[in-house]
Amino acid sequence: MERVWPECTTRCRSLQHALDVISVVTRASEQHIKVFLSSYCCNAVTLKDDFGRNATHIAASCGKKNVLDWLITGKGVDLAVKDKESGWTALHRSIFYGHIDCALSLLKHGSNLYIQDKDGYTPLDLVMKDRPPHIVFKTSDPTELYTWGDNVNFTLGHGTQQSKHHPELVEMFPRSGVYIKQMVLCKFHSVFLSQKGQVYTCGHGQGGRLGHGDELTCLVPRLVEGLRGHPCTQVAGAKDHTVVLTEDGYVYTFGLNTFHQLGIQPPPPNSNVPRQIQAKTMKGKTVLGVAAGRFHTVLWTKDAVYTVGLNGGQLGYLQDPNGEKFVSCPRQVSALHHKDINITLVSASDGATVCVSERGDIYLLSEYQCKKLASKQLNLKKVLVSGGILEHKAAPEHLKENGGQPASVFALDQAGRVFCWKSPGSSLKQCWWVYGRQLFMSDVALNKNEIMFVTQDGEGFTGKWMLEKKKKENTISNIMCHSDSQNVYEKISMQKLPFVHRAVSVATDPSGCNFAVLQSDPKTSLFEVPSVSSSVFAEDFEKLLNEANETDSIHDVTFQVGTKIFPAHKYILALRCDFFSKLFSSGEINSLDFPEVHQKGEDAAGCDLFVIEKIPPELFSHVLQFIYSDTCDMLLQGHKPKLWHKEENENTIICNFQKMGFREDIEGKSAYEVYKNSRICAENEKQKGKTKQSKKTRSIGDETSPVKMLQNTAKKFGLSNLSSRLDGVRYENGRINVFHKKSENKLRFNQKKCSSHYDVMMKSEDGKEFHCHKCVLCARLEYFNSMLSSSWIEASCCSQLEMPIHSDVLQVILDYIYTDEVLTVKESANVEFVCNVLVIADQLLIVRLKEICEVTIAERITLKNAAELLEFAALYNADQLKLSCLQFVGLNMGALLEARSLDVLSDDVLKDLSEAYRKMIPSMNKRIITPYLDGPDISILQSEDIESLISVQDDIYSYQITQEATLKKSKAKPKKKQRKRLDSSGGYNLSDIIQSPTSTGFVKPEKTNSVESLQDLLTSDSEGSFVGASSPRDLQSPDLFPVFTHETKETICVERNRSSPPVANGAASTKMPIPTTSSPKAIPMSRITPSTSPNWVAMPCSPASPVTMDLRAIMELEENIQKCGAMPKLNAGGTKPGTHVMKLSQKQRKMMAMSSKESNNENKPAKVTVAPTTIKSPAKTWAAAFHLGENKSFRDLLLEEKQSVTSFPSLSSDVKKSKHTEELDPSELARRPSGTLNQEAKLKCDVPNQDNSNPWHLTLSKNNASSAPVTFTAIVEEEEKQEAALIRSREKPLALIQIEERAIQDLLLHYQAIDNPEEYITIERAAQIPMATPMWNKH
C-alpha cells in the first residue's frame, strides 16, 4: 500500500481513530494489525475508546499474542492502564477471556498480578471466581499442609531450622500418603492429626511433650507410637504439654506436669508417653472435646465442663480458701452447671476459657468469674479466645504482676460471618473487613497480634484491628456506623496471603511467629485420569506360535506330528512344561514316560527335529496353544472341535489288508471271490466278539471324546493345569460345554530361568549385560521382531546387542516384556525415572507400558512439576497424561500463575492450554468479542502490502502445474517425430529424465516451448552428442525446470522441425514474454512471426547514436553479457530452458560442432522462442553457442591452442573493459565463429557488477576483436577447481554448518526480517567460486 502520512501527531486523541484501531484489532490478522497500527495514526497504541479500552486491552482480550508482544517490546505500552468500565488492566482482560498465553506474556513483561479493579478483584481473583462450581473445598478432602514462620524451634516440620517467608509444603506427609485434618502450633512443638486418627509431633522434646518416650528433638513430624492403636479425633496443645482425645472418648496427655495440667493421679513431674486421664468425677462420662492452655487443660462433655491445672482465675472456680493453687484432678465448673445446658464449643488460652452452649450463650471464664458475653448467637461454628489476666500470686515465679493482655473472643458462624468481643466491657460486634470486596470466612485462627482467616473460596488473609480515630459529627461514615446502636462493626484491615488458593483450615501459635494452613489436595477434583488398556500378553505369544514357520530364524525346535510340522521355541516349552524341559535338557526321554517321541536330525533351518507318534496333530496343536497362551479352543464355550476318524479308518483298511494275506490258495481266483470270502470271515469274527464289544462300548465312547483325548494327552505331557481345567468341560452334541470354569493363572515368564536357552545378550549404555530369549523379545515387541527376525546385522551378530538405554530403564523394559507388569514403575516415587521409562516405551512403541507410566505419573502430579510434565507429555505424545496435566493446570491456574510455574511452557503448549482452559469454563462460550465491522477497509492491506507473500505462493503453485503439463506433453509428443539414433549405448532415457530431481522456481511462462528441445535431446545422435559416455547412467540427469534467483535471464530457444514442411507466415505465432522484474505488474507481450529470418540481420547504424537492433540480435547479445545464466545448445534443434549444463570433453564439443554445422546448412524455417528463465548455476566455459564455427581438425585445434596461450595474459585489460556496455555490430556478431563467442561469454561471466543498461539502445563495441580462445588447459584447471570446491562443500563439518545457520538466524533477527510488513529480506549462503555438479556414481 502506498504510504499515506497520518494527519495527526503523537498527541492525537481522536475518538474516531481509537474506534478504527479497535475495529481492526478485533477482526484483522496479526500481520495486518501491525501494518495498520504502524501507518494509520501516530498515537494508535495509546488511543482509548468511550470505555477506556486501548489496542493492548483488545489484543489481550482477543488472544492476539504476537500483537501484544509487538506492542510491549516495540511500542513500549503501559501495562498498568485500566479501562473505564471495570478498571481492568490488560492482564485482567486476558484472564477473563481465557487467553492464558497472553496472560503469561504480560506477566513476563512486568504486569502486576495483584492490582485491583473497581470491585477489588485482582487477576488472581478472576481465576478464583471462574473456578467450576462443582469444586468445593472441605476438611474431609485429601489435604496438604503448608507452614511458614521463623521456625526457631523446628515447629514447621521442614527438616531444617531455616525460616520460611511464604507457605511451603511439608513434604513428609505427601510422601507417606498421610492427609492432615487438624494442626496445633505451640511455642516449642507442633501437633498434627491425620484423617486416619494418627498423631504426629515435631519440635523440642524436653519434658516429653512430643510423646515419643524420649526427650529428643524431631525435625520432621514423627508418629506417636503410644497412640497407634487408639484412633484420635482431636488434639490440643500448649507450651509444655499435649492433650489428645480418642474416638472412644478417652483423653491422653503427655509432657511437663509443672502445674498439674496433665490430670494424672498421682501427679508426676512429667510424662514422656501418652497416659490416660482416669478421674472418678468423670466416670461414665463421654468426653466430646479438649482444649489446653499453658497452665491448665479443659475437657467437656455434653452437659459439663471440667478443668484441671493452675487456678489463676481461668478455671472457673473461686480461690481456694485453704490456699491450694493446683487442681490435680479434673473438676466440674459449677458456674456452668445449668439445667438443660448443652455445651457445643470450648476454647482456651493461657489466661482465659470460653464456652458456648447450644442456645447460643457465650461464657468467659476469667479472673475467677464466669461472665456471659452474649446470648442467642446461634449456628456458631468455631470460637477462639486470646489473652487473659491471671493472678500472679498463683505462680509468682512464672507470672508477673499486672501482666498479660486483655482477653479477646472471636466467634465464627455457619454463614461465614465473624463476631468479636474485646475486654473490658464491650459488646459482641460483627467484624467489618476493610478490603475491596466482601469476604465470607470458613475458618479463623487467633494470636496476640493478628487474626488469620480462610474464606469459603479457599483464600487466606491476615487481619489486624484498625485504630479508632475521632470522627466528626454528622459525617456519612458516622451515620452509617451508628445508625443502629445494635449493629456496630469492628474494623479489621485485611491483607491477602500469597500462594494460598485452596485453604480449608488455618492455625497459628500464640505469639504469632509461626503459621500453618491446610489446603485441599490439588488433584481432588481431577477426573481426567489415564487408564491402562487390557493385556495382550497371551495374544502376543499365540501370534508367535501361529506365525512360526520352518524357515524363520526365531524358532529353535520343530515337531513332526503325523504329516504336520510344528515349529516351536524351546524356552517357552521348557518353562511351561516339565516334559519338554527334561527332553531339551537331557536330549532324550525315558521310554517308559513317553515312548512315542524320538529325535530325527534337523529341520530346514538347522534346528532340532522331534517326531511324535500316536497323537493326532490337532491334539498336539491344542497342547501347544495352551502352553503359549494358557488357554485353548477346548476351554471355550460353544466351540465345535473336529473329530479325528481318518487315522482309525486307515488303520482298519491296513489291518484288513494284512489279514487277507498273499496265500497260494487265492491264486487264480477272481477279486470278487476273495472279497466275498473275507467278508464271511469278518462276520464270523464279529459274532464271536459281540459280547466283549458291548462291555467296552462306554469306554470307547469316552476315548473318542475330544475332551477326554486332550485330557489324556495333557497328562502325558505333564500339563496338570490343563488337565484339571478340562475336568469342568464336557463334549455334548458336537459342542464344548463349560459347566465349571476354574480360575486362570496369569501367564508369566521368568527371565532368569532356563539359562541354557539364552540366545540374545543386550548391553546397556552403562555397560551392564542382560541375557534374554529371542522368541520372547520378538513376540512382545515389533521393534525386536523387525530387528532379529530379518536380515539386519543384529539378527546374525554373535556379540552383544548394544542398546542406548540405561540399565535401570532397560531392566524395566525386560520385566514388562517377560511378566507384563512393572512393579518398579508403579512403586517408584522418582517421577524422573518413570518419565525416562515412558520415553523409551514411546520410542520402542510399547503402548501399554507407556499407559502404565502415564497412570503412575498422573498420580504424582504436583504444583511444582505440573508445567514440566505438561511440556513432557506434549513432546512425547502422551495424550492421556497431557489431558490430565491440562485439567490439573486449569483447576489450579491461580496457584500456578502466582508461582510463575507456567513460564517453562512452549508457545504451542500454551495455545493448547488456553483452549483447554476455555473449554473447562462453561461461561467462556459467551465471552467473545464480536469483530467491529464498521472500521476502515483492510482489503487494501491484503492486496498491496502483503502481495509479495501471496504472489510467491501463487507462483509456486502455478509453476508446479506447468511442470506437470510439460511432462505429460513430453510423453505424448515423441510419437509424431522421427527418431534418428545410430547407437543405443548413449543418450538419455525418458524415465531417467522424468525421475530426475527438478528445481522449483517462481517463473510463470505463458507457453512452454521446450518440449521439442527435449525430444531432440532424446532422439539425438548418441555418437555426435554424447561421445565418451559409456552408458546413460554415466551422464548427469538434466533438470527440466529453472532454479529461482532474484535475477532474471533470457534464453533464445531455436527449434527446427526436421520432418515437417515449412510453416506459412502468420499460420502460427509464438508469444514472447518479456523477462520478469521485481514489480508485480504485468508487461505487455511482443510477438514475432515465423517469417523472421533465422539469421541475424545487420542494420546500418552510426557509432555516435544508439541504434534499434533486431530482437534476435539483442537477445543473443544479452545472453553473451549474462552468460552466467546461459543455456548450452547441444544441437541445432531446440534446447531445454534452465537445464543444468553437463560436462563435455573436447571430443564431444568437436562432434557437436560438426553436427550443428550440418544442420545449419539446411535452409529450413525456424521458430524462435524467448522464454524467461532464472538460473542459479555457475557458468560453464565449454557451453556451446548458437552459431558454431567451422569444423577444424585436431591438429588445427592444437596449433590454435598454442597461439592462444601466448596471447592469453593480455585479456585482463579486455575483461576490465567488458564491465561497461560494449558497442557490438550485430552483423559482425553473426559472422563471428562460435569459439570466440564462447570465450567472450566466459570472460564476461567472471566479471561481477555488470551494467544492466537498456538492451534496446546498445552502442557498438570499438574493440571487439581483442579476444583469445579459451585453452583446453584452462578448462581442465577450472574443472579441478570446481571439483575441489564440491569436495570442500561436501566435507564441511556439521558444527560449521550449525554456526552458519545460527548466524543466518541472528542476521534475520537483527534486520527484523521475520514478519516484517514493510520489506522482504532473505539471507542465503553465497557461493564463493563455481562448484561442480554433484553426481551419483554407480558401484
From Swiss-Prot:
ANK repeats mapped onto the chain: 51-81, 86-115, 119-154
Localisation per UniProt entry: Cytoplasm; Membrane
Domain BTB residues, every copy: 555-636, 758-826
PROSITE patterns the UniProt entry points to: ANK_REP_REGION, ANK_REPEAT, BTB, RCC1_3
Region (Disordered): 685-704, 970-993, 1058-1089, 1208-1237
InterPro entries: Ankyrin_rpt, Ankyrin_rpt-contain_sf, BTB/POZ_dom, RCC1/BLIP-II, Reg_chr_condens, Signaling_Regulatory_Domain, SKP1/BTB/POZ_sf
Listed Basic residues bias regions: 689-698, 970-980
Alphabetically ordered keywords of this record: ANK repeat, Cytoplasm, Membrane, Repeat
Function: Acts as an inhibitor of BTK tyrosine kinase activity, thereby playing a role in B-cell development.
Protein name: Inhibitor of Bruton tyrosine kinase
Species whose genome carries this gene: Xenopus laevis
